[in-house]
């Protein structure tokens, strides 16, 4: 039986609270909370929020990790007509402070201890939230988030300058959710059993909670005490009865460091959903070997177009024949085009910037008209967004990714795509993972290319010195890379830094190399 689109997120959650009140919606390391719990707790908290007399539709910050109280608070805020701004409890203080400055929230709900002192914004803590749950207040839903009202606001993790708050409306959310639960590429089962690992402050989280709540499924998550310790994390993850794994490819790469991450130990896994960064052929091949019968979905899209705008199930033929995986068939309701520098549409097969239009495109950045005007525009009478990504559309309607426009550099007259260099580095038999980073001179021209490298196990035992390893890697690469693309310096590391969202922190490495 195929899934049906939903008309309203809160009405759908209410429906499941009536039809399956004792079915688990949230499981934190074996501790279950049901759809009935979610309804009564969110109703009771919504009643308390209404009594605070906050300005109508004003945004509210919710600070915490993956606790059940986070989800119940989000639902309560939606019922009471407020957009929520999730901030992860591991966020840097400067980031938390910058978000408060931009967002000017009417309230902070701190599920985890709030790290900033002397905040003028009113605050509710975890004990008060739990006390509100215990009151068991009834609640009549008369002024929920609807239509073009903001449902959530997610701040992108810019490494420089002020973070930008992407406003996602209820209509935006429905466009994404209904595509995901009805799309043949995702093939999302009813009552999905989903891993809820990416933090709520990262819009990849919407890829697990939206379809799960829309289809009456269960979210499985882990307390932050465990997620901070990789050994504990993977010992716990392997015991979860999940069917769908949603994460960045980097997180799956980390999981594959464990020999237990395979279909024998985790026989329940039927789907992998990837988004947030590029899924390489190498990672997908390794995953296919570990989980030969699982469906691997490569999805793509910016936060500004509500999580994702395209998706494709990776086939064995793709893995055998392609150097770079396609990023998917685009959503039917979201016309996606390739344009040139003058803004003209390009024919299939030609490379340009990917722009997306339609009902999933955000209304813009919160309280930031300047940045909104730079990135958002109207295209053929539809709201549209400049992704800043390079791409090509095939005649079959598949979108191909060509890297970030801001990760394209000019070196010795050649235009070089940093992600191309990184992908080729990863083909070396000596390399487990690598990224290419430019070093600039004082005139901001690229002086040379560096590579940060994690070596495969036992490589060091084969060579006496790092210089010998570098020589062997360069010999490995001469057949597959132009000489001007091969980095001149190789820096060997045990690990590469990740952003709070689980992506390799390329911008951070660029800043490190250039001592910014």
UniProtKB/Swiss-Prot annotation:
Pfam families according to UniProt: AMP-binding, AMP-binding_C
A biological process term (GO) from this entry: lipoteichoic acid biosynthetic process
| Residues given in the record as D-alanine binding sites | 203, 307, 503
Kindly state which reaction or reactions the protein catalyses: holo-[D-alanyl-carrier protein] + D-alanine + ATP = D-alanyl-[D-alanyl-carrier protein] + AMP + diphosphate
Where along this sequence does the record place binding of ATP?
156-157, 298-303, 389, 401-404, 503
Q: Pathway involvement?
A: Cell wall biogenesis; lipoteichoic acid biosynthesis
Q: Where in the cell is it found?
A: Cytoplasm
Which controlled-vocabulary keywords does the entry list? ATP-binding, Cytoplasm, Ligase, Nucleotide-binding
Listed GO cellular component terms?
Answer: cytoplasm
Q: What does this protein do?
A: Catalyzes the first step in the D-alanylation of lipoteichoic acid (LTA), the activation of D-alanine and its transfer onto the D-alanyl carrier protein (Dcp) DltC. In an ATP-dependent two-step reaction, forms a high energy D-alanyl-AMP intermediate, followed by transfer of the D-alanyl residue as a thiol ester to the phosphopantheinyl prosthetic group of the Dcp. D-alanylation of LTA plays an important role in modulating the properties of the cell wall in Gram-positive bacteria, influencing the net charge of the cell wall.
Family in the record: Belongs to the ATP-dependent AMP-binding enzyme family. DltA subfamily.
What is the protein named?
A: D-alanine--D-alanyl carrier protein ligase
């Amino acid at each position: 039986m195929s899934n049906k689109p939903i008309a309203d997120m809160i009405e759908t959650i209410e429906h499941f609270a009536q039809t399956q009140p004792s079915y688990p919606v949230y499981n934190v390391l074996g501790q279950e909370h049901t759809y009935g719990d979610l309804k009564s707790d969110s109703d009771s908290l919504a009643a308390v929020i209404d009594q605070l007399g906050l300005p109508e539709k004003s945004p509210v910050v919710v600070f915490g990790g993956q606790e059940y109280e986070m989800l119940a608070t989000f639902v309560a805020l939606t019922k009471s007509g407020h957009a929520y701004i999730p901030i992860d409890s591991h966020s840097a203080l400067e980031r938390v402070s910058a978000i408060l400055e931009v967002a000017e929230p009417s309230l902070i709900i701190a599920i985890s201890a709030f790290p900033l002192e002397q905040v003028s914004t009113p605050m509710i803590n975890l004990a008060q939230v739990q006390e509100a749950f215990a009151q068991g207040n009834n609640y009549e839903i008369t002024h929920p988030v609807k239509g073009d009202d903001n449902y959530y606001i997610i701040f992108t993790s810019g490494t420089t300058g002020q973070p930008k708050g992407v406003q996602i409306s209820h209509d935006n959310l429905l466009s994404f959710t209904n595509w995901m639960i009805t799309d043949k590429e995702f093939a999302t089962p009813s009552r999905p059993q989903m891993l809820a690992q990416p933090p709520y402050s990262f819009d990849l989280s919407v890829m697990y909670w939206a379809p799960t709540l829309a289809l009456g499924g269960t979210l499985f998550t882990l307390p932050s005490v465990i997620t901070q310790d990789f050994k504990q994390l993977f010992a716990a993850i392997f015991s979860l009865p999940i069917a769908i794994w949603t994460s960045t490819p980097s997180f799956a790469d980390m999981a594959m460091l464990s020999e237990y991450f395979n279909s024998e130990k985790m026989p329940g896994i039927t789907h992998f959903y990837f988004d947030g960064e590029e899924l390489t052929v190498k990672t997908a091949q390794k995953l296919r070997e570990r989980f030969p019968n699982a469906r691997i979905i490569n999805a793509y899209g910016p936060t500004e177009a509500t999580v994702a705008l395209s998706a494709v199930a990776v086939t064995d033929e793709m893995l055998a024949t392609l150097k770079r995986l396609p990023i998917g068939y685009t959503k039917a309701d979201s016309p996606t085009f390739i344009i040139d520098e003058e803004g003209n549409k390009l024919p299939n097969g030609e490379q340009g910037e990917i722009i997306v239009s339609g009902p999933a495109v955000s209304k813009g950045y919160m309280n930031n008209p300047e940045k909104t005007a730079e990135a958002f525009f109207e295209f053929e009478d539809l709201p549209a967004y400049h992704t800043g990504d390079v791409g090509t559309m095939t005649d079959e309607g598949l979108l191909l990714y060509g890297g970030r426009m801001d990760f394209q550099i000019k070196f010795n007259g050649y235009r070089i795509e940093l992600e191309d260099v990184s992908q080729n580095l990863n083909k070396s038999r000596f390399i487990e993972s690598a990224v290419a980073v430019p070093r600039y001179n004082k005139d901001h021209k690229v002086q040379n290319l560096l590579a940060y490298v994690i070596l495969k196990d036992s490589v060091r035992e084969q060579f006496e010195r790092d210089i010998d390893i570098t020589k062997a890697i360069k010999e490995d690469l001469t057949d597959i890379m132009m000489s001007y693309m091969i980095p001149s310096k190789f820096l060997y590391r045990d690990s590469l830094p990740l952003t709070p969202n689980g992506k390799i922190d390329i911008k951070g490495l660029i800043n490190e190399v250039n001592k910014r």
